[in-house]
Amino acid sequence: ELPKSIAKSSDIAVNGVPFKCDIGKFNSTTFNYVAAFGAFTDVPYDTPQETKNILGHTAYVLEGMKRLSSLPSYHVKIKYDNGEFEGDIFLCMILNATSVAGLHKTKQLKNVDLNDGLFEMLVFKRPTNLIEFQNILINLMRGENSGDEYLFVKSSYFEFECDENIKWTLDGE
């Protein structure tokens, strides 16, 4: 994690020790942080920087809460090492990160290895009511590995099928 001080961060950029990390391939583009689609993927970009500076993680939560009534739904088929998933989801993230959109205290992301040849996938199944949405957040924060609300897997590849065009967001390309 980089220090908040510009001087200290600059020093790391100039004098820091390089390290190897996994690089993902998304069609003809590469990325090393996250590839995502669905609800909230634009929240980090649409939330005003001043709000993020003042409220931190809470800024993401507040912006996301404004959108709960209009969650999208995607019927997808996903193949990955040792398995596949088919169902209706509202958010999917392919990650090589220990923190994304303020999620950093989850058991799953604490154990991410940035140089193991694997990416992590979080797929959030579409809730039908606010209680199900709350259960997603509770189980994710508890570190439950997978369940009725979401799926967390590590894999060397992910292959997606969907009947509609999906707008992916790549970060770290």
Language-model features: locations:
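Gly/Ser/Thr-rich active-site loops/lids in small-molecule metabolic enzymes
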Residues: 51-58, 99-103, 107-128
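Short acidic/glycine-rich loop or secondary-structure boundary segments that cap or lie
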Residues: 40-43, 86-88, 99-104, 129-132
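A generic structural signal for well-ordered coil/turn residues at beta-strand boundaries
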Residues: 20, 27, 72, 88, ...
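Catalytic core of DAGKc-family lipid kinases
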Residues: 2-94
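Short, solvent-exposed secondary-structure boundary motifs
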Residues: 11-16, 101, 149, 169-173
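Phosphate-binding core of ATP-grasp and ATP-grasp-like enzymes
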Residues: 93-104, 141-144
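ATP/nucleoside-binding phosphotransfer catalytic cores, i.e., glycine-rich phosphate-binding loops
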Residues: 80-82, 86, 113-116, 123-173
